[in-house]
Amino acid sequence: MNTQAPIKLIDGKAAAARVLAEVAEDVRALKAAGIVPALAVVLVGDDPASQVYVRNKVLRAEECGIRSLEFKLPADTAEARLQALIAELNADASVHGILVQLPLPAHIDEQRVLQAVTPLKDVDGFHAENVGGLSQGREVLTPCTPAGCLRLLQDSCGDLTGKHAVVIGRSNIVGKPMAALLLKAHCSVTVVHSKSANLKTLCRQADIVVAAVGRPRLVDADWLKPGAVVIDVGINRIDENGRSRLVGDVDFDSALPQVSAITPVPGGVGPMTIAYLMKNTLVAARLQQTAPSNLTQRAEAACPSIS
């Protein structure tokens, strides 16, 4: 008799739909109180992939009842002009979230621009104040992909207390904030990266593996202990048998017999990223109702006038 528990495919599309439904319900409640959450999306240049990403974000916002504003600037826009636009959006009380679509043209300092967004409107969670707050376990706007990953884990595993989690990758966008969120959820966390020794050995000790390194099929069954839960953040385009396809950082077919739950690529983490952008916009709108004067002070400090 086969007593092995059935493998659980973690459906990111279904989970994202639940998050978006929750957001839409809360947005309706805010609107009933006279508050219309609004997200401003800034796109510099005409990169086709960025245009698709922006359109998807605007569509999800509209579905949730969030007002969306698009600002499209030419690729040769001076950084001072972009900074001036951000300053205007920071000061506009009707705008609750600001997202600057990355990547930016090479002549613009990406970090300087991201730090110009006032922390209470930083729905990407990239501002240093939000990054620091997350590391301290405070309630702040959190990067969308790690927040979505945590929700997938909680929905799949329940209470994460005491679980050993290994995060593969140490990027500012996923790896580091993911580790902070797992610590906040009372996991024991190990972060491994390209310079780590004994990668496979460390990963095989983990109850939870989050792979976020951008290397196609790096992690296979040999990296995973039986019954592990795997969140695959990687999205890599490869050519295989004459066809282009998307694969994750985890070798899905190899890992499948070894794990108790795993996200597919595509259809796993990706939908949750946009869902949590909408959730962050909702949270930002709420935060700004409780700290409007604080918001004004932060906006002035973050975005001084540009002469």
Swiss-Prot record:
<feature type="binding site">
    <location>
        <begin position="169"/>
        <end position="171"/>
    </location>
    <ligand>
        <name>NADP(+)</name>
    </ligand>
</feature>
<feature type="binding site">
    <location>
        <position position="194"/>
    </location>
    <ligand>
        <name>NADP(+)</name>
    </ligand>
</feature>
<keyword id="KW-0521">NADP</keyword>
<dbReference type="Pfam" id="PF02882">
    <property type="entry name" value="THF_DHG_CYH_C"/>
</dbReference>
<dbReference type="GO" id="GO:0004477">
    <property type="term" value="F:methenyltetrahydrofolate cyclohydrolase activity"/>
</dbReference>
<dbReference type="InterPro" id="IPR020631">
    <property type="entry name" value="THF_DH/CycHdrlase_NAD-bd_dom"/>
</dbReference>
<dbReference type="Pfam" id="PF00763">
    <property type="entry name" value="THF_DHG_CYH"/>
</dbReference>
<keyword id="KW-0554">One-carbon metabolism</keyword>
<dbReference type="GO" id="GO:0000105">
    <property type="term" value="P:L-histidine biosynthetic process"/>
</dbReference>
<keyword id="KW-0658">Purine biosynthesis</keyword>
<dbReference type="GO" id="GO:0006164">
    <property type="term" value="P:purine nucleotide biosynthetic process"/>
</dbReference>
<dbReference type="GO" id="GO:0035999">
    <property type="term" value="P:tetrahydrofolate interconversion"/>
</dbReference>
<dbReference type="InterPro" id="IPR020630">
    <property type="entry name" value="THF_DH/CycHdrlase_cat_dom"/>
</dbReference>
<dbReference type="InterPro" id="IPR036291">
    <property type="entry name" value="NAD(P)-bd_dom_sf"/>
</dbReference>
<comment type="subunit">
    <text>Homodimer.</text>
</comment>
<feature type="binding site">
    <location>
        <position position="235"/>
    </location>
    <ligand>
        <name>NADP(+)</name>
    </ligand>
</feature>
<keyword id="KW-0368">Histidine biosynthesis</keyword>
<dbReference type="InterPro" id="IPR020867">
    <property type="entry name" value="THF_DH/CycHdrlase_CS"/>
</dbReference>
<dbReference type="InterPro" id="IPR046346">
    <property type="entry name" value="Aminoacid_DH-like_N_sf"/>
</dbReference>
<keyword id="KW-0486">Methionine biosynthesis</keyword>
<keyword id="KW-0560">Oxidoreductase</keyword>
<dbReference type="InterPro" id="IPR000672">
    <property type="entry name" value="THF_DH/CycHdrlase"/>
</dbReference>
<keyword id="KW-0511">Multifunctional enzyme</keyword>
<dbReference type="GO" id="GO:0004488">
    <property type="term" value="F:methylenetetrahydrofolate dehydrogenase (NADP+) activity"/>
</dbReference>
<dbReference type="GO" id="GO:0009086">
    <property type="term" value="P:methionine biosynthetic process"/>
</dbReference>
<keyword id="KW-0028">Amino-acid biosynthesis</keyword>
<comment type="pathway">
    <text>One-carbon metabolism; tetrahydrofolate interconversion.</text>
</comment>
<comment type="function">
    <text>Catalyzes the oxidation of 5,10-methylenetetrahydrofolate to 5,10-methenyltetrahydrofolate and then the hydrolysis of 5,10-methenyltetrahydrofolate to 10-formyltetrahydrofolate.</text>
</comment>
<keyword id="KW-0378">Hydrolase</keyword>
<protein>
    <recommendedName>
        <fullName>Bifunctional protein FolD 3</fullName>
        <ecNumber>1.5.1.5</ecNumber>
        <ecNumber>3.5.4.9</ecNumber>
    </recommendedName>
</protein>
<dbReference type="GO" id="GO:0005829">
    <property type="term" value="C:cytosol"/>
</dbReference>
<comment type="similarity">
    <text>Belongs to the tetrahydrofolate dehydrogenase/cyclohydrolase family.</text>
</comment>
